[in-house]
Amino acid sequence: MSDVYETCPAFENDKFLLRFSQLDDAEDLVSVYSDKNALPFFNSDNCHGDNFYYPNEDRMRQAIKFWLSSYSSKWFVRWTIIDKEKHEAIGTIEVFHRSTNDNFNHVGVLRLDLKSEYETSEEIFTIMNLIVPPTFDLFECEEIITKVPVYAVERIEAMKRVGFKKSTKLLDGTMDGYAYKDYWIINRGVYSPLDDLEAKEKA
């Protein structure tokens, strides 16, 4: 698990590039995190009350500084998602290894934040197939969980295609003690996307 905090790999396919988030991403990412149509799909569980709505570039830069600080502290890794055709950041992915005494101990937690126009089954499926396979080894986990609210119909379809299944278990908030629902889970042994999309690690 320590390797990813020493050198963060990038991943890409024909459409998207996932690479370590940078402060300069703020200019593009503010359009993601100020997108009120995207906001309901962000996972802010156990995040000190932050709802990830950043209405200006100043606030966006503050958030990215926190992401970079968290990476240095080995709390989580944040990748920026680049649309290769537009040369534009259209979202981020956060992943970390969760160690706690609840139903989701020693799992990888994956958070996907996207600009609302990319909240489609096809786009999500393409992005998830870049990050899910390497996550098991990078974060030393046998299972990965991600939150998918019941109204996120496009995301639900994409997660099913990747191989995730809805869990009935609740996630205990280590910060607030609240029990969070709507988590989907995938096991390393059953990862088998229904479509054959090839992702390659960028050297």
Outline where the language-model segments fall.
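Acyl-donor (CoA/ACP) binding surface of acyl/acetyltransferases
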Residues: 1-42, 78-203
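A general structural-boundary detector
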Residues: 16-17, 47-50, 68, 146
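A short gly/proline-enriched turn/hairpin at secondary-structure junctions
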Residues: 39-54
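Charge-dense, low-complexity intrinsically disordered segments
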Residues: 50-58, 118, 122
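A short helix-loop-beta-strand connector motif used in the catalytic cores of GNAT acetyltransferases and
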Residues: 52, 59-80
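Short, intrinsically disordered/low-complexity patches at protein termini
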Residues: 52-55, 63-65, 169, 178-180
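Short, well-ordered alpha-helical scaffold segments within catalytic/effector domains
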Residues: 57, 61-64, 125-129
